[in-house]
Amino acid sequence: MAIGEICTREVVIAKRDVTVKVAAQLMREYHVGCIVLVDEQGGKRKPCSILTDRDIAVAVTALGLDPDVIRAGDVAAKEVIEMNEDAGVAETVAVMRMKGVRRLPVVDKEGTLVGIIAADDIVTLLAEEMSGLATMISREHKKEAAERRTSASGRD
């Protein structure tokens, strides 16, 4: 399954020069733990970083810095790690694990932001798939047991 099929398409975004306070207000308003910082290039939004609530807590609040002055781009991750929407779930999990991140911007072939994928989204998907598989296995076991009973009673 392509990650583009399960990513969240409504992404909270901001430019890297917004203040940390504005970024935090966006997170609160939209009930999210991160925002994707973007650059506009030819009318397209290209992810340049991701700012998390943890970044704010550790790099601003804990140090007593002024969130009205500090810019989101100054405390956000310097390396943008993104996934192409055609990437598979296993590949995405591998990148998250290797890079130690829980959220990744999702981009199209041109590098334009199209969504965000969180580890929670993948865990939910896998849990639903495993539940469906367990239900199918249980149903098959019951069917086979019923067939054995029917066949055994036919021999009597």
Please report, for each region that a protein language model flagged, where it lies by residue.
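A glycine-centered beta-loop-beta connector
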Residues: 27-30, 35-55, 96, 104-120
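Context-gated lysine
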Residues: 15, 21, 44-46, 78, ...
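The conserved cystathionine-beta-synthase
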Residues: 13-32, 38-39, 83-100, 107, ...
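Tandem CBS (Bateman) regulatory domains
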Residues: 1-9, 48-84, 88-97, 118-156
